[in-house]
Amino acid sequence: MGVAATGSGQVPSAVTASPISFNADTGTLNAVIFNTTSDITQKSNVTEITDAVSIIDKLQGVEFDLTLYGTKSAGVIAQALETVLPHLVSTDHNGIKSVNYAGLTGYLIEAIKELGRNR
């Protein structure tokens, strides 16, 4: 299922009083909570993340201005992330890359745990 937006607006929710809103001018999608499916029944080949600090050390967090909207943001550069964790980067039909930031969470959790063990 997909949702096509031809302009700004809101998608009302039958469950909560907080709708999903989309601003076509800024490319901003807002919701109270974004969930990512994480149920074990939907996964296969589950393995532990090892050497997470080494992986995270190869990444660079950056601040930047979004050229299309002129707004300040922070994150990673998809092309740089792709050299380290290519499965967290997608490329659309125009060649524009996007990042699965939720996918970084497991690496960050394990890196923090590794750092804690090494204190």
Model-predicted segments: where are they?
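Short helix-capping/linker segments at secondary-structure and domain boundaries
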Residues: 6-12, 113-119
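C-terminal intramolecular chaperone/autoprocessing and neck/assembly modules of extracellular spikes
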Residues: 29-101, 111, 115-118
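Conserved, well-structured core segments
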Residues: 1-3, 106
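Small/polar residue-rich beta-strand/coil "junction" motifs that cap repeat-based extracellular fibers
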Residues: 5-7, 13-44
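Short acidic, glycine-rich loop/turn motifs
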Residues: 3-7, 66-68
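Assembly/interface hotspot detector across virion components, adhesins/toxins, and nucleic-acid enzymes
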Residues: 1, 20, 89-90
